[in-house]
Amino acid sequence: MEDSVFTKIIKGEIPCYKIYEDDKTLAFLDIAPEVMGHTLVVPKNQVDKIYELPDEDYVAVMATVKKLAQQMEKVLGKRPIMKVIGVDVPHAHVHVMPFSPEWKDGVTLEPSEAEMKAMQEKLAF
């Protein structure tokens, strides 16, 4: 299987705005966010569909999603929402985003590097 863009990020071949990492998962800001703080949680084990993950990796992804959601609510003061879509990148992942009334599903922002770094500093744990 060819490395996905997420595997290349995990390997350090492509830079990212890292929020959290452990031995099984990586969480980083989406570079085309729907809202500021839009974060992706990916397993380090590359599989196409989230339901193809071994149970241990699936549980690790969901544990990271939970930690990230708690951090997001604490730091940003907004209730997070999660989406599992599974069609845009052939590597299982979960979108975690702070909910905002002005959010429009599918509309992306173009934040500056300074805005991305500032959000990374707020959310990183």
Q: Where are the model-predicted features located?
A:
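HIT superfamily nucleotide-processing domains
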Residues: 1-125
